[in-house]
Regions:
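Hydrophobic alpha-helical scaffolding
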Residues: 36-39, 61, 81, 85, ...
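Short coil/turn helix-boundary motifs
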Residues: 53-56, 109, 160, 203-204
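A compositional/structural signature marking long, glycine- and acidic/polar-rich segments
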Residues: 84-103, 110, 130-132, 176-185, ...
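Phosphate-handling DNA/RNA-contact segment within nucleic-acid enzymes
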Residues: 1-102, 115-123
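C-terminal or mid-to-C-terminal helical accessory/interaction module adjacent to the motor/catalytic core
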Residues: 140-206
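Conserved phosphate-handling catalytic cores of large alpha/beta enzymes
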Residues: 96, 102-162
């Protein structure tokens, strides 16, 4: 499935491709950098999301183009994706000038063998930290666990009722709850506390 990607003015600058076969080795293919497209600064859905973000003061960040299109189909216009997993400072700074708060909606991925967290959680750990360090107010809407089955915004949020059922949590509190283990050794607990304190330093007083 070929999906056009537009810049903030609505001009097509590249295409992203989504495999329709669930057994495909590569799920997504993105366009290469060129004179009119730079992956590190491009944002999928930005042409629609910016106007809505100015009105709501909030932007929802998901992982893939189908996630954006699913939420747009439900009337949620202020949603974007980086199409690469990692958000760059250049991409996030686009929302700084509008004073937007950011809310991440990670995929629910089953952790790989030996891993404590799934890829979707790691996506938010990394990008939520960057956004917090840049001075954004950050929150998370987490898709509930479905056992061994992967769920993303496209497959789970199929109605406004599903959307409204997702509770929104402060990123730092969510991050702390994910990492802190009351039964862990003292030194491990102290590492988590120090990590959370590093995040709290970036919180701006209102």
């Amino acid at each position: 499935l070929m999906i056009p990607q537009r810049d903030r003015f609505g001009r097509i600058v590249t295409f992203t491709a989504r495999a329709l076969n669930s057994q495909a080795t590569v799920k997504y293919l993105n366009g290469k950098d060129c004179a009119i497209y730079k992956k590190s600064s491009a944002i999928f859905g930005i042409d629609i999301a910016l106007k809505a973000a100015r009105q709501t003061g909030k932007v929802y960040l998901v992982e893939g183009a189908p996630d954006v299109m699913r939420l747009q189909s439900l009337g949620i216009a202020n949603v974007v994706a980086s199409l690469g997993g990692c958000w760059s400072e250049e991409q996030l700074s686009c929302f700084n000038k509008f004073g937007c708060t950011l809310c991440f909606i990670p995929d629910h991925d089953v952790p790989k063998e030996g891993d404590e967290f799934g890829a979707g959680e790691k996506f938010v750990f990394r990008n939520g930290r960057l956004a917090t360090e840049m001075g954004f107010q950050v929150s998370v809407r987490e898709i509930p666990s479905s056992g061994s089955q992967k769920q993303d915004a496209d497959s789970y949020i199929v109605s406004l009722e599903r959307w409204e059922s997702l509770s929104e949590k402060d990123f730092i509190l969510w991050y702390a709850a994910k990492h802190y283990d009351a039964s862990a050794a003292n030194d491990e607990q102290l590492k988590v506390i120090a990590d959370v304190c590093d995040l709290l330093v970036n919180v701006q007083s209102e």
